[in-house]
Amino acid sequence: MSNKVHVGSLEMEEGLSKTKWMVLEPSEKIKKIPKRLWNVGKEDPRRVIHALKVGLSLTLVSLLYLMEPLFKGIGSNAIWAVMTVVVVLEFSAGATLCKGLNRGLGTLIAGSLAFFIEFVANDSGKVLRAIFIGTAVFIIGAAATYIRFIPYIKKNYDYGVVIFLLTFNLITVSSYRVDSVINIAHDRFYTIAVGCGICLFMSLLVFPIWSGEDLHKTTVGKLQGLSRSIEACVDEYFEEKEKEKTDSKDRIYEGYQAVLDSKSTDETLALYANWEPRHTLRCHRFPCQQYVKVGAVLRQFGYTVVALHGCLQTEIQTPRSVRALFKDPCVRLAGEVCKALTELADSISNHRHCSPEILSDHLHVALQDLNSAIKSQPKLFLGSNLHRHNNKHQNGSISNNKHHQRNSSNSGKDLNGDVSLQNTETGTRKITETGSRQGQNGAVSLSSFRTDTSALMEYRRSFKNSNSEMSAAGERRMLRPQLSKIAVMTSLEFSEALPFAAFASLLVEMVARLDNVIEEVEELGRIASFKEYDNKRDQTADDVRCENPANVTISVGAAE
């Protein structure tokens, strides 16, 4: 009896705890809502301004309903103005212009075409009029839908074609039953014009948000982010002690993440920037497509940074004692690349051409020093130079194997196989011991591993026997185990140097791709009419920037 009471009390406690958890969990989420709302506005204060602009626009357009004189003039069709404000008013001025003009042109063309259809079908009978309207709806609908597949129309006027189809069908089909269809089209056009006018006023004149400026800032931020990623990657690779892994977001990944994910954002911002009027003091045309090209080149450059980051996460790593031999030229080479990226970011940010000495002699000196450092350690990358001794030992082991095989030919088939296997193992051990002695005599000694060839040969022989037994039993499916990381390292004499060779080659590839980035940025400055580089005014700023390029913060505009 006591056991039953005890079990019942436990179940009751579990039920109460679950109920308490179900009650407290929503309350905890509700408490986090104000903080999340605050963070949304803190990340980009322009979001708060946009929300206030939308609220004010809806209030103004609602006056068409609230004020009696305006309502009498427009009537119930004023709801189209409210719908226009909700649909058209976007975050940036370019997006609002794109949607507003598309909606206005679509409505105007659809109304004109519907009026023409009504004028032609007015004199025909009721049946012929229905057939004519149905045929017109079919042809116009099919043609407009097919036009939407054209890439240029899809990119720039897709929303306008949708509004055209909607307005044309509403007016044309309703004209068969309603006589005052022209008045309906007239009222709808005016209400949509009022809504679009309010949206354009709010977007262009009240704290305007330009897509071109957002594209400009994101390009600067991507250059700065790549610079920080490269610097952090090289610093972490040459750290003396291994860094403990944390759950926080990787600082290296944060730098190049925006570059890899920027394709759709750049194209959208460039599309909206193409609709925006010239609003700068010089009134130059905004080179939106050139910004897209710069973004594409930066993504190609970013892939190299991703591969460089991958060198830090490989399973087989070069010992830190070996990395230290090449630390100085690699750090200087990466520093020069970071300086160049920071200079490009500053030139775009300040609307000026970059320095003519952006690729300084220090970069070429760092490349030459890295090349000399690698050449100074040939045994590290090419293995031992004493190939003649290896050949002698190999020839001796092969001759010994043949001699033992001839002597043991009369011992039987199985015994002959075992003796030849043992001789092969003995010869292989001699080669391994000779290679280890040569590694000790080299300039740089790597941590050596002893290849257990006998175990490998025994494994192969047992694998054949087990495979034959399983095939006899009818079980033919078997997964062959793969070699471990140690087996891979023992199979290559210079396997420890391969990760660093990949790291160094990626640094050199980064320098090669830097030329493409500089060319596109210079082309951007030429098209956008950037001001010329002033050596006297910018010399001090360049010296300060080049010392610590990683402290520059990214300012990326929001885009919708």
Curated annotation (Swiss-Prot):
GO molecular function: monoatomic anion transmembrane transporter activity
One GO-annotated biological process of the protein: malate transport
One Pfam family in the UniProt entry: ALMT
Topology of this chain in the membrane: Multi-pass membrane protein
Keyword flag Nucleus: no
Record key words, sorted: Cell membrane, Chloride, Ion channel, Ion transport, Membrane, Sulfate transport, Transmembrane, Transmembrane helix, Transport
Transmembrane segments: 54-74, 78-98, 104-124, 130-150, 156-176, 189-209
Observed effect of gene inactivation: Impaired stomatal closure resulting in a wilty phenotype.
Annotated compartments: Cell membrane
Tissue expression pattern: Expressed in roots, stems, leaves, flowers and pollen. Mainly detected in the roots vascular stele and in the leaves guard cells.
Main location: membrane
Comp. bias (Polar residues): 407-421
Region (Disordered): 386-421
Induction: Not induced by aluminum.
Gene Ontology CC entries for this record: endomembrane system; plasma membrane
Keyword Membrane carried by entry: yes
InterPro entries the UniProt entry points to: ALMT (IPR020966)
Entry's family note: Belongs to the aromatic acid exporter (TC 2.A.85) family.
Function, in words: Malate-sensitive anion transporter permeable to chloride, nitrate, sulfate and malate. Involved in dark-, CO(2)-, abscisic acid- and water-deficient-induced stomatal closure. Belongs to the R-type anion channels.
Other comment: Malate functions as a gating modifier as well as a permeating substrate.
Protein name, UniProt field: Aluminum-activated malate transporter 12
Gene name of this polypeptide: ALMT12
